[in-house]
Amino acid sequence: VNPFDEIEWIISRIKIKNINGDILFDQDIEHPVFWDEMAVRTCAEKYMKSDLGNLPHNGERSVKDVIHRVSFSITKRGKDLGYLDEKGSKILYDELCWLLLHQFAAFNSPVFVNWWLYDVYGFKGNSKTKRWAIKNRDAEVYQQQFEYENAQGAACFITEVEDELIDGENGIYDWVNTVM
């Protein structure tokens, strides 16, 4: 059973204003009936794409669009790299959709913001950006042609191998104590 077909959907008008009262966002958004207003507003404002020029219906207007984009892209990548067959890909897609729809799991913002505009909508981004990606299961790397070909999925990075959470010379906790 398709996870999107198992639940009831409604459409709500989402209007977001800035401090001065100027309207930043004003759209009808389709979402699960059990999502609260904050979840719908966050998804609409932060993660729905509307400015790429080649999106259906002038942009994403449903939580389905966002969840499909992310879940499809993860399973496509797993299949392309040889980790999943057709059956495993379908199972993982359905499971990811269900978990995200029912809010049992959520990815960090870069996943929802960046993944995978290239795979689903063909959005390439800046071709001058030089990025490297894994080509296959043997961890061969290649230089991407387009910015969103393998989009960034994390916002924070450990700065060096010796970086760690514990106290000590390279510990993050130690650093926090010195700046507070």
What are these regions (language model features)?
Residues 1-180:
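Extended catalytic cores of very large enzyme megasubunits
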